[in-house]
Amino acid sequence: MNDSTIFVLIAIALAIILIAILFTFVPVALWISAIAAGVKIGIFELVGMRLRRVVPARVVNPLIKAVKAGLDLDTSRLEGHYLAGGNVDRVVNALIAAQRANIDLSFERAAAIDLAGRDVLEAVQMSVNPKVIETPFIAGVAMDGIEVKAKARITVRANIDRLVGGAGEDTVIARVGEGIVSTIGSQNDHKKVLENPDMISQTVLSKGLDSGTAFEILSIDIADIDIGKNIGAELQTDQAQADKNIAQAKAEERRAMAVAKEQEMKARVEEMRAKVVEAEAEVPMALSEALRQGHMGVMDYMNYQNVMADTDMRDSISKASGTKEEQHSKNDPRNRNVDK
């Protein structure tokens, strides 16, 4: 093999390597597609995107769609939105949909909505085709104590001007629920709510609940209404039970105080008895002292003994007669019938 042949082979190899590098760093196929679609973009501009770590297809393909749709966009704005973390394809689709629906939406507004975390394409579609939000059953209590449950369907349309910074669906549902509860609670009779459910939707809709939200409420319709519990009766029952428990506690307290008082009186009786016994024990000593000092004679002492004997006899007789009367009363048939 001569030197000229080796040189040719080396040249071919270098050419292949250069072509591979060119097709790796320069999306030639994408550039050809853009040129064919009428998009003016230079091949070195695509190389610059590669160097800036931008996927050229993420910018060029949406640009092709925008040009075909008649939108006035350029690569610099699309590339800037991509570098900011936005979804270029979704923004372009939203702009195309807005143009077709005659909605005034600029690229800057669409990019801001996209960067705010909102789905700008869904917002445009919702502006054309309103969305229906269905709430769960919301319970309210009328003034007569009856619980009324209502489910509402909220028809909303996206307000593109308030998508950035506006509240979402949860806020709309919460506000509508608050309005339903307030409307039901202001009625004297729950039957009025059942007879005219449209009253709820009219009252809630007139409150301007969509202020500060990203939506415009078009209508509020009551989809279902039902009767719940008798909250008033349950509250009265609970109150009666609480009053009963309080009364029982107070009665138990009084009973405990009465028992304590009774025990105290028994203790005092025993104390008095002990004093009586103590005093009786001092009587013989006093008698002996009186006899010793001559204050009492023998006859006086004998009279005292007779009086004590008579007293003991009377006590024995009275106790015996009381026992017999009690036994006779128990054995009387008339008393038995009364007991029965």
UniProtKB/Swiss-Prot annotation:
Keywords: Cell membrane, Membrane, Transmembrane, Transmembrane helix. The keyword Transmembrane applies. It is found in: Cell membrane; Membrane raft. It is a single-pass membrane protein. The chain crosses the membrane at residues 6-26. GO terms for cellular component: membrane raft; plasma membrane. It holds the Pfam family FloA. Coiled coil: none annotated. Residues 314-340 are annotated as: Disordered. Found in functional membrane microdomains (FMM) that may be equivalent to eukaryotic membrane rafts. FMMs are highly dynamic and increase in number as cells age. Flotillins are thought to be important factors in membrane fluidity. Homooligomerizes. Belongs to the flotillin-like FloA family. This is Flotillin-like protein FloA. It comes from Shouchella clausii (strain KSM-K16) (Alkalihalobacillus clausii). The lineage of its organism: Bacteria, Bacillati, Bacillota, Bacilli, Bacillales.
